[in-house]
Design a protein with these regions (language model features):
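Regulatory and interdomain segments flanking nucleotide-handling catalytic cores
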Residues: 1-184
Length: 184
């Protein structure tokens, strides 16, 4: 066996392929985006249209970078992509899918921002449509909780509370109470 063949064995030791006829959902998540968005680029909290537009640019790029994407869902610094269950791009190599989606997101986002933004990617292999629905309900629920908490936190800070006071006030508070706090 040649040195190249031996090295390829080591290199591919962790290669796995997603099983056919399963849905793949990739979650591409911004790395250290709190620092990037608040400290380095001073995006407005809890929501900044400029940041949203950058994430839309990245998501659109991901939908057109060689994978058969059926749905893209954005929340905050995260993009979830539902890949066609029959997509055989790169032989469904999970390592390739993970690395390329993270790299493509980084490239498109960074070019649009004019500075480097990094992403990681994880992959869910889902056997049924019901599990796909569960996945997107989970992400939607997370988006709702995060947005509600961020708006309440921002309101408490705007009213003069310190970061510690706002955090303590919201700790353990039910979503319904947070809603009432915002709309009282």
């Amino acid at each position: 066996m040649s040195v190249a063949a031996r090295m390829r064995e080591f290199e591919s030791a962790l290669d796995q392929r997603a099983p056919p006829e399963n849905f793949l959902v990739a979650r591409i998540d911004g790395r250290n985006f709190t620092r990037l968005t608040r400290e380095r680029h001073r995006f407005k909290a809890p929501f900044d249209e400029r940041f949203r537009d950058l994430m839309v640019i990245a998501a659109r790029h991901l939908m057109d970078c060689g994978f058969r994407v059926r749905l893209a869902y954005l929340q905050s610094d995260e993009i979830s992509l539902l890949l066609d269950k029959n997509d055989a791009t790169f032989g469904r190599s999970m390592r390739k899918i993970l690395s390329l989606l993270a790299a493509e997101a980084r490239a498109s986002f960074s070019v649009a921002l004019g500075a480097v933004g990094a992403f990681d990617c994880r992959l869910s292999v889902l056997p049924t449509v019901d599990r796909v629905v569960d996945y997107f309900l989970w992400r939607q629920g997370d988006a709702f909780r995060n947005a509600l908490n961020a708006y309440c936190y921002g309101m408490l800070r705007d009213q003069g509370g310190s970061a510690e006071e706002a955090t303590a006030h919201l700790r353990g508070m039910a979503s319904s109470a947070k809603h009432d706090l915002l709309f009282a």
